[in-house]
Amino acid sequence: MKQSVKKPPPPGDTTVRGELPNGKLEEAPPPVLPPPPRPMADKDTSNESSSGSATQNTKERPPTELSTTEATTPATPAPPLQPRTLNPASKWSKIQIVTKQTGNECVTAIEIVPATPAGMRPAANV
């Protein structure tokens, strides 16, 4: 009488449907790959701020358009605007943001506005 010797299936072989643990065929989940590195073109190399210009003169700029959801549902009502008063003992300086174009490059600089005596200052720029 000849005995049949059962060979174990090779590892990872799912085509053999012999004895299965717990009666279920288990499949390994797909491996999780790390995200690909960012291309160099997307990298921020400039010193620009995402907040934009912080100038006080808003009369020269056209009003920005709000999306329909922002225009119909205001978050909180804005308090009435009051003129600012400057403290003469303050160490802060007034600045101006200037952008100049040379060729195909733009250069943005912050210039310190020279201090003027309080009597010489126009009221609209305070």
Swiss-Prot record:
Location of this chain's protein in the cell: Cell membrane; Postsynaptic cell membrane
Entry superkingdom: Eukaryota
Function: The muscarinic acetylcholine receptor mediates various cellular responses, including inhibition of adenylate cyclase, breakdown of phosphoinositides and modulation of potassium channels through the action of G proteins. Primary transducing effect is inhibition of adenylate cyclase. May couple to multiple functional responses in cell lines.
Biased composition regions of type Pro residues, renumbered to the chain: 28-39
Protein name: Muscarinic acetylcholine receptor M4
Keyword list, A-Z: Cell membrane, G-protein coupled receptor, Membrane, Postsynaptic cell membrane, Receptor, Synapse, Transducer, Transmembrane
Annotated spans, Disordered: 1-90
Membrane topology (Cytoplasmic): 1-126
Annotated transmembrane regions: none
Membrane topology: Multi-pass membrane protein
Gene Ontology cellular component list: postsynaptic membrane
The species this protein was found in: Bos taurus (Bovine)
Gene that produces this protein: CHRM4
Family to which the UniProt record says this protein belongs: Belongs to the G-protein coupled receptor 1 family. Muscarinic acetylcholine receptor subfamily. CHRM4 sub-subfamily.
Biased composition (Polar residues): 47-57
